[in-house]
Design a protein with these regions (language model features):
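Non-catalytic accessory segments flanking enzyme active sites
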Residues: 49-155, 166, 256-288, 292-312, ...
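Hydrophobic beta-strand positions that form the internal "hydrophobic ladder"
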Residues: 98, 163, 209-210, 269, ...
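A flexible loop/linker signature enriched in serine peptidases of the S9 family
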Residues: 103-110, 143-148, 167-176, 191-196, ...
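Beta-propeller blade signature
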Residues: 114-117, 178-182, 226-238, 283-288, ...
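Polar, glycine-rich mid-to-C-terminal structural blocks
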Residues: 230, 234-274
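Active-site-proximal cap/loop segments of hydrolase catalytic domains
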Residues: 523-745
Length: 745
C-alpha cells in the first residue's frame, strides 16, 4: 500500500498570528555595499525585553498551528517508539578498564559505563566483560532537573584509572571539564571553565591533562561574544583550575586553535593547529622530557594541506593528509631531530586510492616489536568501506565486510590492542556494534541492531547537471513507486567538507514508514569526494551547492529533463522516474543545511511545497560578528571583503527575500541559547519572510527555550521538535499516516 495523499493540502494559518515585527531599518555601507537591515534589533540576546516579546509572540502563533496539525500527536508517539530502544557505542579499553557509552532508549542523555577487564584478552574481538560487570560511571541525567546538561567530551587516561569529562548546558558550546576516578567513581570537583572547541589530552602519568581554554567572556555575553584567542592550558590534578598555566598560545594569531595529542610514550606533544573551519591546518610539536614540556616547533607550517594526527609509532608521527592527494593518504614524519634545519620529509605509508580516505585508526604498536595496524575508512559514493593496512610499511591486509549502504561512525582500539570495535548504522537499521580481530581478520557481532526495517528500500542515483554528478539516496518502502505525487523530503547539507552518509534517524524512519520518500543528497561543498568536491562548493563557488540541490529537486519532479538526468548507483532505481511534483516536495536542512534551505526557498520558491530551515545561517553579511561565526569564512568568505560580500549578497537568504512574492509554507526553527549559529539568523529571517510573503502559505517561527544548536537536547524536546517538523511537512506535502504503520518495537 502506498502513501495516502491529500491532492490539495489545506493551508493552515495561525488562529492568532503574531503582529508584524517592528521594522527599524539600519542603513550602512559595508565593504563598499549599501545594506539595509530592518531587523537589526533582533540581534540582541534572547533575554532582551523586545526580543523576548517577539519570541513569545512567534511561539504562541506557531505552537497553536503545529499542535493542531492532523496526526501530530500520533507522529510523536511513533517517534517515541522509534527512539525507545537500547543504544550502545563502540566499547574501548584503557589499562584494566573497559568503557562504553549507552542509552536505554528514552534517557535524555547518554551515560558512560565501565567494567574491570578482569584479565580478559584484549586481542580477542568482542571479548568484553559480562554485561553484569558494567556499572554506571557518569550519568548526566542526574546533573539537571530539565535534562539539558550533557556529557560532551571524554578523555580516558592511558591506565584507565581516571576520566576527564566535559559538561555542557542547554546546548551551549561552552564546556566545563572535571575528572572522575574510575574505581571509586569519585569526582574531583575541580571544574575547568571557559573551554570549548577542544578535547582533552592526558599526560602519560595521569597527573593532569591539556585542554583549550578561552578568556572569560564579558558579563551577559557568554552566548554571543567572539570565540578568539584560544590558549593551550595544563590542568594538574589537585590544583586550582584558575591557576592553570598556559602551555602555548599565539596572541598574534587569535584565530588559531589547538587540538592536543600526547604520544602514548609521553615523549611528544603534537598540536593540530586549526584556523576556524579552514580546510588546511598546521602541525606543531614539542618534546617532553623529565615531565617538562619543551618549546613548540612548527613541523608542518605552510598551511597548504590538512593533517590529522594518528599517533607516534616508534619514532614516526603518522598523519592523514590531503597534501598532493586530494582524496587522502597516510604519511610518516621522523621526529628524531625536531631542530633539523631542513623541511621534514613525508614518507608515504598508505597511498591515495580512488575513494576518499575519511578517517584512520592506529591500533597496536605500543612497543617497537609490537604489531601495528591502520584501519582505514573510505567513502565510496558516500557509503563506508573499511580496509586494514600494516602500520609500519602500509601493506594492504584485508577488508572488513559491511552490510550494504552504511556509515561507520566510530572505530575504537588502543595502542595495546589487537582488535577493534566499530559501530555501524544505515537508513533502515539503528546502530549495531561489531568486533574485529585484526590478526585473524575475523568479524563478530557484539550488539545487534534493535531492529531492521526489511520493508525499506535504499537506492542511489547520481544526478547529472552542468557537467557534475551529485549522489542522491532514495529511501522508501518497497511498495512506494514513482507516480509524480509521492510526498518527498529532500535533505542536504553541502559544506565544510562534511560528508552526508547513511544514518538512522527516527524521524526519517517515521516519514518513510508512513509512505513518504526520503531523498538525501551529497552536495558539492561536502566531504563525499575529497578536497576538490569541497572546494567546488565554497567561497566564490558556494552557489554550486544550491545548484546541486535544485537539480536534484528537478530530477525528482521530472523538470528540466533536457538539462538534468540520472544514472543508477545502487538498487533498481529508474533513472527516468518522476517521483513527485513541486507541491509535494519539501526541502529540509540544519545549520549550514539551513542556509541551503533558505537559498533554495528564495531562489526558486515555485519548486517547493514546503521548506524547513533549522538553526540556519541566514544572514551572510553578519555571521562573522558572533561567537565562532568568523571561522566560517573558510566556506563563505569574509563579509568585510568587497569581493566576498558581493558573492554573499547573491545568495544570503535574508537579503534575497522579495516583498510581494509568494513563498511556500515555511517552518523556521532555532534555540534561544544556540551559541554556534546564534538565533538572530532565524529571528531576522522569519520577520523578513513574514513581511515579504504575498501568498497564502504560513511562515512559522519555532524557538526552543534552553536549547542550543542541537547537541545535548533532551529527548522530550527532541520528540516535540521532530513531531512538529514531521506534522508540518506531512500536512503541506500531502502525506497522511497509514493505519498499519509498523511499531518497530
Amino acid at each position: 500500500m502506498g502513501a495516502a495523499i491529500d491532492p490539495e493540502p489545506a493551508v493552515t494559518h495561525p488562529p492568532h498570528p503574531p503582529p508584524p515585527a517592528r521594522r527599524d531599518p539600519v542603513v550602512e555601507v559595508q565593504a563598499g555595499h549599501r545594506i539595509v537591515d530592518p531587523y537589526r534589533w533582533l540581534e540582541a540576546p534572547a533575554d532582551d525585553p523586545d526580543v523576548a516579546a517577539f519570541i513569545a509572540e512567534q511561539n504562541a502563533a506557531s505552537r497553536a498551528v503545529l499542535a493542531a496539525l492532523p496526526g501530530r500527536d500520533a507522529l510523536r508517539e511513533r517517534l517515541a517508539a522509534r527512539t525507545d530502544h537500547p543504544r550502545r557505542g563502540a566499547p574501548w579499553r584503557r589499562g584494566d578498564w573497559w568503557f562504553q557509552v549507552r542509552n536505554d532508549g528514552l534517557q535524555d542523555q547518554d551515560v558512560l559505563w565501565c567494567a574491570p577487564a578482569e584479565g580478559g584478552a584484549p586481542s580477542a574481538a568482542g571479548a568484553l566483560p559480562a554485561d553484569a560487570c558494567f556499572r554506571v560511571l557518569l550519568d548526566p541525567n542526574t546533573w539537571s532537573a530539565e535534562g539539558t546538561a550533557a556529557l560532551s567530551g571524554l578523555a580516558v587516561s592511558e591506565d584507565g584509572e581516571r576520566v576527564a569529562f566535559a559538561r555542557s548546558d542547554a546546548g551551549s558550546d561552552w564546556l566545563v571539564w572535571d575528572v572522575v576516578d574510575t574505581a571509586s567513581r569519585r569526582v574531583h570537583d575541580e571544574p575547568v571553565r571557559w573551554a570549548r572547541f577542544s578535547g582533552a589530552a592526558w599526560l602519560p602519568d595521569g597527573s593532569g591533562y591539556l585542554y583549550g581554554g578561552y578568556p572569560p567572556p564579558p558579563p551577559g555575553q557568554a552566548h554571543a561574544a567572539l570565540a578568539r584567542g584560544q590558549q593551550l592550558r595544563l590542568h594538574r590534578l589537585g590544583t586550582d583550575p584558575a591557576t592553570d598555566p598556559v602551555v602555548h598560545a599565539r596572541a598574534d594569531r587569535p584565530e588559531w586553535g589547538f587540538a592536543p595529542n600526547v604520544s602514548h610514550d609521553g615523549r611528544f606533544i603534537v598540536l593540530e593547529v586549526w584556523h576556524g573551519t579552514h580546510p588546511t591546518n598546521r602541525i606543531h610539536v614539542a618534546p617532553r622530557r623529565d615531565g617538562q614540556i619543551g618549546a613548540f616547533r612548527p613541523l608542518l607550517d605552510a598551511g597548504d594541506a590538512r593533517y590529522t594526527v594518528l599517533g607516534v609509532l616508534d619514532d614516526d608521527l603518522l598523519l592523514v593528509t590531503d597534501l598532493d592527494a586530494p582524496l587522502g593518504r597516510v604519511v610518516a614524519v621522523d621526529l628524531t631531530d625536531l631542530d633539523a634545519p631542513t623541511p621534514p620529509v613525508l614518507r608515504e605509508v598508505v597511498s591515495e586510492q580512488p575513494d576518499r580516505l575519511e578517517r584512520v585508526t592506529l591500533v597496536g604498536g605500543s612497543g617497537r616489536d609490537d604489531a601495528a595496524w591502520l584501519v582505514c575508512r573510505r567513502l565510496h559514493h558516500a557509503t563506508a568501506r573499511l580496509a586494514v593496512h600494516e602500520a609500519r610499511g602500509g601493506a594492504y591486509l584485508h577488508d572488513l565486510d559491511l552490510p550494504g549502504a552504511v556509515t561507520v561512525p566510530s572505530v575504537t582500539g588502543g595502542r595495546h590492542a589487537r582488535s577493534v570495535h566499530l559501530t555501524v548504522e544505515g537508513f533502515a537499521s539503528p546502530v549495531s556494534v561489531l568486533g574485529h580481530d585484526l590478526e585473524q581478520a575475523l568479524t563478530s557481532l557484539v550488539t545487534p541492531p534493535a531492529f531492521a526495517a526489511e520493508e525499506v528500500v535504499v537506492e542511489q542515483v547520481r544526478v547529472h547537471h552542468d557537467g557534475v554528478a551529485v549522489p542522491l539516496f532514495l529511501v522508501h518502502r518497497a511498495e512506494v513507486v514513482p507516480d509524480a505525487r509521492v510526498p518527498t523530503v529532500l535533505w542536504g547539507y553541502g559544506g565544510f567538507d562534511v560528508a552526508v552518509t547513511p544514518a538512522y534517524r527516527p524521524a526519517w524512519d517515521v516519514w518513510v514508514d508512513a509512505g513518504g520518500l526520503l531523498a538525501v543528497a551529497g552536495l558539492r561543498g561536502g566531504g563525499e569526494y575529497g578536497r576538490a568536491w569541497h572546494d567546488d562548493g565554497r567561497l566564490a563557488r558556494k552557489e554550486h551547492v544550491f545548484d546541486d540541490a535544485l537539480a536534484c529537486a528537478a530530477w525528482l519532479t521530472g523538470q528540466r529533463r533536457d538539462e538534468v538526468h540520472a544514472e543508477v548507483l545502487r538498487g533498481a532505481a529508474d533513472p527516468e522516474a518522476v517521483w513527485t511534483a513541486p507541491r509535494h516536495l519539501g526541502v529540509e536542512g540544519r545549520s549550514n543545511g539551513g542556509l541551503l534551505v533558505g537559498a533554495c526557498l528564495t531562489r526558486a520558491p515555485e519548486a517547493l511545497g514546503c521548506a524547513v530551515p533549522e538553526v540556519g545561517v541566514l544572514d551572510l553579511t553578519r555571521f562573522h560578528r558572533f561567537t565562532i561565526g568568523w571561522a566560517w569564512s573558510s566556506d563563505y568568505g569574509d563579509p568585510d571583503d568587497p569581493d566576498d560580500l558581493e558573492v554573499l549578497l547573491r545568495y544570503s537568504p535574508y537579503h534575497r527575500l522579495e516583498p510581494g512574492r509568494s513563498y511556500p509554507p515555511t517552518l523556521i526553527t532555532t534555540g534561544d541559547t544556540d551559541d554556534r549559529v546564534v538565533p538572530m539568523h532565524s529571528l531576522k529571517f522569519a520577520a523578513a519572510l513574514q513581511h515579504a510573503q504575498d501568498g497564502p502559505a504560513p511562515v512559522l517561527l519555532r524557538v526552543d527555550t534552553s536549547a542550543g544548536h542541537g547537541a545535548g537536547k533532551p529527548v522530550a524536546k527532541l520528540l516535540d521538535e521532530r513531531a512538529d517538523v514531521l506534522a508540518f511537512e506531512a500536512h503541506h506535502l500531502g502525506l497522511t499516516l497509514r493505519s498499519d504503520q509498523s511499531p518497530r518495537r
